[in-house]
Swiss-Prot record:
Lineage, uppermost ranks: Eukaryota, Viridiplantae, Streptophyta, Embryophyta, Tracheophyta
Domain of life: Eukaryota
Extra remark beyond the main annotation: On the 2D-gel the determined pI of this unknown protein is: 6.6, its MW is: 25 kDa.
Name of the featured protein: Unknown protein from 2D-PAGE of needles
Organism: Pinus pinaster (Maritime pine)
Length: 7
């Protein structure tokens, strides 16, 4: 995950 991104 990158911060709050769902990937």
């Amino acid at each position: 995950l990158y911060g709050n991104l769902p990937f």
